[in-house]
């Protein structure tokens, strides 16, 4: 793995030079730190692999071993800075999903060089048409980010409470053991009973003692119930969404002129698929099942078994006359 990490220009490898630091730019090709200083001494230059104009201040340490992944991540970050609309800005969920699909298409085209010029013009046109919306969404914190921050804040508070509770319990237990030891010594000194009775009585009293209770300090809240310092506040009303008719699945019926094929459960119980080749692991991963092949063969075998031309002759003649 260390031999694969090499500079394409000077051929230095991580194996021969453990301190080798590979840098990557927007084009996705890597260069070592020494080559970057030599080629981009004036602040700008071209990539030796693809001749793309680059700037020296845009080089950064490579995070992924695959250069394509590094390039795609960089493109995604740049595109999402401009294509930053949220779901609340769309009247319907379908419009938002189409918007996300358009973003993925743009990222794919830029990363793979497909329709590069047309995609760049499309991005530039979007920036011009949505300049105000882009700046507004950049300044406004999205609800998802605020929700994550709220979760992190709550998680930190819970961890702090558990830590305080554990420290309190340890202190109380240590002090209680010290007091019990002193009380036992006093009883042994001043009591007239035998030492065995004193120790047994003391042990019974210790077991009956209740565990110390840790009381959390009350959190400061407003009259509305909002916590002080809670960062997430929804200051904008949601855009009313269009009511859409829910999709209802209706199974289609086909006229096969034959007996109906068995159901999927009957294929296993009645052993229809006994002599069907089982699906391979690759086929199962792709959604294939041996029941599909068995059911298709049965449907083809049963189709047309109950078709009698004499019964359908008049129907076929009338349909042909209407067509003519």
From Swiss-Prot:
Pfam families: MAT1 (PF06391), zf-C3HC4_5 (PF17121). InterPro entries: Cdk-activating_kinase_MAT1_cen (IPR015877), MAT1/Tfb3 (IPR004575), Znf_RING (IPR001841), Znf_RING/FYVE/PHD (IPR013083), Znf_RING_CS (IPR017907). It comes from the Eukaryota. Keywords: Cell cycle, Cell division, Metal-binding, Nucleus, Zinc, Zinc-finger. It is found in: Nucleus. CDD domains: RING-HC_MAT1. NCBIfam families: cdk7 (TIGR00570). Stabilizes the cyclin H-CDK7 complex to form a functional CDK-activating kinase (CAK) enzymatic complex. This is CDK-activating kinase assembly factor MAT1. It comes from Marthasterias glacialis. The lineage of its organism: Eukaryota, Metazoa, Echinodermata, Eleutherozoa, Asterozoa.
């Amino acid at each position: 793995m260390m031999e694969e990490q090499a500079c394409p220009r000077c051929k230095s490898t991580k194996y021969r030079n453990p301190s080798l630091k590979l840098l990557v730019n927007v084009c996705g090709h890597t260069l070592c730190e020494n080559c970057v200083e030599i080629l981009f001494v004036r602040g700008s230059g071209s990539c030796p692999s693809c001749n793309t104009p680059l700037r020296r201040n845009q080089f950064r340490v490579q995070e992924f071993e695959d250069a394509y992944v590094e390039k795609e991540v960089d493109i995604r970050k740049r595109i999402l800075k401009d294509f930053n609309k949220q779901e609340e800005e769309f009247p319907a969920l379908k419009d938002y999903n189409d918007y996300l699909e358009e973003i993925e298409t743009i990222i794919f085209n830029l990363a793979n060089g497909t329709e590069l010029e047309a995609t760049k013009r499309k991005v530039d046109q979007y920036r011009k048409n949505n300049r105000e919306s882009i700046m507004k969404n950049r300044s406004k914190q999205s609800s998802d980010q605020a929700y994550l921050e709220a979760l992190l804040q709550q998680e930190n508070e819970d961890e702090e409470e558990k830590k305080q509770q554990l420290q309190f319990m340890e202190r109380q237990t240590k002090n209680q053991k010290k007091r019990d030891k002193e009380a036992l010594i006093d009883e042994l000194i001043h009591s007239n009973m035998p030492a065995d009775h004193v120790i047994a009585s003391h042990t019974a009293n210790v077991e009956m003692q209740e565990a110390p209770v840790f009381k959390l300090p009350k959190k400061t809240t407003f009259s509305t119930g909002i916590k002080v310092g809670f960062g997430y506040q929804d200051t904008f009303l949601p855009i009313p969404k269009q009511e859409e008719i829910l999709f209802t699945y209706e199974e289609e019926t086909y006229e096969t002129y034959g007996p109906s094929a068995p159901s999927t459960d009957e294929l296993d119980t009645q052993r229809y698929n006994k002599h069907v080749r089982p699906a391979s692991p690759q086929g199962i991963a792709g959604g294939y099942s041996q029941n599909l092949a068995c059911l298709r063969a049965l449907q083809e075998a049963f189709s047309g078994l109950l078709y009698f031309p004499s019964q359908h002759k008049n129907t076929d003649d009338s349909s042909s006359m209407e067509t003519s």
